[in-house]
Swiss-Prot record:
The active site is at C198. This is E3 ubiquitin-protein ligase RNF144A. It comes from Mus musculus. The chain crosses the membrane at residues 250-270. It is a single-pass membrane protein. GO terms for cellular component: cytoplasmic vesicle membrane; endoplasmic reticulum membrane; Golgi apparatus; plasma membrane. Residues 16-236 are annotated as: TRIAD supradomain. InterPro entries: E3_UB_ligase_RBR (IPR031127), IBR_dom (IPR002867), TRIAD_supradom (IPR044066), Znf_RING (IPR001841), Znf_RING/FYVE/PHD (IPR013083), Znf_RING_CS (IPR017907). Zn(2+) 2 binds at C111, C116, C135, C138. The gene is Rnf144a. Zn(2+) 4 binds at C185, C188, C203, C206. Zn(2+) 3 binds at C143, C146, H151, C156.
Amino acid sequence: MTTARYRPTWDLALDPLVSCKLCLGEYPAEQMTTIAQCQCIFCTLCLKQYVELLIKEGLETAISCPDAACPKQGHLQENEIECMVAAEIMQRYKKLQFEREVLFDPCRTWCPASTCQAVCQLQDIGLQTPQLVQCKACDMEFCSACKARWHPGQGCPETMPITFLPGETSSAFKMEEGDAPIKRCPKCRVYIERDEGCAQMMCKNCKHAFCWYCLESLDDDFLLIHYDKGPCRNKLGHSRASVIWHRTQVVGIFAGFGLLLLVASPFLLLATPFVLCCKCKCSKGDDDPLPT
């Protein structure tokens, strides 16, 4: 008995084999899938695993062609995805797509109550100032800008650690802002929840790296020096040994590039005159008149 992926050699010899750009294997055409938008072709098994992995991890954008050098930068259509994944994975894909649509829709917003998460409609779309939004599911009234409870006559706070549920007051939450389980990305203002682990956070929406406790940017802090001083000292959530190992790796990478450049510099200096001479000879040969 033969599987759908492997067939006898005498059968394979009759069909032309197509190469998959993901696994670099060669398979018959019926075991390959072509993306309609860009016409890039991959083996069905690889493409299926690629799509399932993106959906399970929580895709941030449309599922693009796996080929990084795709000339058309194609994307998989919904009907193509539905043909290759299970029903429960497809259901999760549609849910993620809907959440992203609401996130970027100026007419809609999510109810900030953690037990509700209904979609609310903004009354006045053209209004530039924060407006009152009332959730029809839980009757919570909140600000359209900062998603906190409605605060008439007051400006929006810079950061909101958590949104209170209906019937609760601030006295029920004695935790400091740094200990809040839900915060907003300081760059794109998307809500992020942290259960435990590392305090170096990266927003899935805008890829901004920041400190969970003080919300300071860590985009350029490759060595995580931020956690060596100040109020966030020793709050990274990793052992000192793992931090030292991380820094050693980063320094090693930069040192390796520097050493490579240093070693290659003499060769580049020696090769430059030869390259210039060759170019001069070629240009001189082009200018010489043809013999008569």
